[in-house]
Amino acid sequence: IEGIDLSNSMLEQARNKNIYNKLEHRDIVEYLSTEDLDFNYFISTDVFIYVGDLFDVFRLIKSRNKSRGKIAFSTEHTDKDGFVLEKSGRYSHSKKYIESLCEKFDYKLSYFKKTDLKKIRGKFIIGGLYLLDF
């Protein structure tokens, strides 16, 4: 299990769990561009809200991973087209946008659920939970 994050505090929390073989303080696109990728699963929770355009993430996983696999991830959800930078400073992504990336890079959308992800200042944040096969 490998973990990457830009937040030192999140990496410290991960380190304290003692389950990771490797932890790196890096940008996700840089990591996917430079590391040998041979994973069955990519799991990304509360990450894509800081990325916005997921084109390179989807492209790099599909083109650089040595085997077939699955991607499980969450997004903050929007019904607008594409992805939107919200007032919170986080990005939300539409299901239609994720489906367009799936079509472009030949991923299969196996599961989607719109749900309450978390509560911030007393208000639920609506998110999308996805499972893709590639």
Show where each model-derived region lies.
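Class I SAM-dependent methyltransferase SAM/SAH-binding core
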Residues: I1-Y31
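Local beta-strand N-terminus motif with an aromatic residue
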Residues: Y20, D38-N40
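A conserved beta-strand element that flanks and buttresses the S-adenosyl-L-methionine
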Residues: I43
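Hydrophobic adenine-recognition pocket in adenosine-nucleotide-binding enzymes
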Residues: V47
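A short glycine-rich, Lys/Arg-flanked "PGG" loop and its adjoining helix->strand segment in the class I
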Residues: F55-K70
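Short, glycine-/aromatic-enriched active-site segment of Class I SAM-dependent methyltransferases
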Residues: F73-Y91
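Short alpha-helix
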Residues: R90-D106, F112
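Core SAM-dependent methyltransferase catalytic element
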Residues: D116-F134
